[in-house]
Amino acid sequence: ALLLIVLIVGGIRGGVFTPTEASVVAVFYAIVTSAFVYRGFTLADLWGAFLRSAIMSVAVLMILAAARAFAWVLIIEGVPQMADAVIAMDLSPIAFLLMVNLLLLVFGMFMDPLPGVMILVPILAPFATARIARDHFAIIVIVNLTFGLMTPPVGGLIFVVPRDPAEPSALIREQPPFFLAAMASLLILTFVPALSTWLPQISFAR
């Protein structure tokens, strides 16, 4: 099983396959290993896994469809103009980062990360990269929008993780301590840029 990690990371780093293709390779490797090495995986188990994956995929796609529709409403109502207003304030770097965090957190509550990146990053990036490192800004955007996956009203992960349809509400009730810890980590990432920039600097150093 540990070879799966080596296979995925090595294949991506070596340019053998893309991250999307790596997921297919991982599934194939897991099926072959379970069936022929551990000998605990039957055709009935495979069909059950496919069925559970299909049900989960349908649930996620329905959430994404609703989120995209709501994203269109937000765009029509002027959310991009809110980003322009933040830029027009001419804030200090610290105040700007706090405003960007707030904007992205609210935006991420109603939309999945990809549309959020496509809509807000082109507006904020030119101003942000003039004040902070590009890697730092990218991490802040990704972390903020990812938090939206576990916060109502959309919260895609809230509906993906539970197996029982009644569990999302119970999951939401258990969230506050973890969400506070996530907010603390976000503030640390925001005000300690080295945590966001050291790995890219090492990885791409010549």
Swiss-Prot record:
Classification via Pfam families: DctM (PF06808)
Gene Ontology terms: cellular component: plasma membrane
Cell inner membrane keyword on record: yes
Main location as per UniProt: membrane
Compartments reported by the entry: Cell inner membrane
GO function terms (MF aspect): transmembrane transporter activity
Alphabetical UniProt keywords: Cell inner membrane, Cell membrane, Membrane, Transmembrane, Transmembrane helix, Transport
InterPro entries: DctM, TRAP_DctM
Protein family (similarity comment): Belongs to the YiaN/YgiK family.
Identification of the protein by name: Putative dicarboxylate transporter subunit
Species, as recorded: Paracoccus pantotrophus
Gene this protein is translated from: dctM
